[in-house]
Amino acid sequence: MRLVLIAAVFTTACVTASQNTRSGAAVENPIVQVGHPVLRERAKEVTTDQLGTPEFQALIARMIEAMRQAPGVGLAAPQLGVSLRAFVLEDRAELQTSLTPEELSERERVPVPLRVIVNPVVTPVSEERVTFFEGCLSVSGYAALVERWGEVEVSGLDEKGQPVTWRVRGWPARILQHEVDHLDGVVYVDRMLTRTYGTLPQVKARFAGKPIADTKRALGVK
């Protein structure tokens, strides 16, 4: 799922009904929105036979393209209407320019190169829980505080079917958990602190640049 980033949130821009190509022509946004039944299904495991097919490789390419066009930092197959357990993740440096060094440090946010993970299994590796704003390409225009594990390990396959294991903390761990939730039919609004839910412009206007402790205090959450 895409995670949004306006200051404290995961995206630089919310997704509209259409997107513009570099040539200026409008194209239909392929990312399905909350309410679509595929976002509430447990996605199917990708079989060994499926992995090497042109169709599956084309799906991965479409996921990467949609994530980058949004722009977002992650996207799961169900967000393109495909019930398969696969996601892509990439947090490019240019998506972090609106954040101060203090914000980047607090979020433990660093650039992450493109990763494709198929049939992921996520395990928390510490008891630490961390709360920050999240948004989603499938819940366009909104954000809320969500508590997640501070450090996790994911195991699965890459797009070529090779085993991968990745232990990660901070912001990449948040993105990863957000995307795996999509594969289980879970959207971030299921986990959010409901009193913190608001539009992206409201969240940006009130909380951009503020430490998370001050934000939580202002919103009346612990």
Feature locations, PLM:
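Bacterial N-terminal signal peptides
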Residues: 2-13
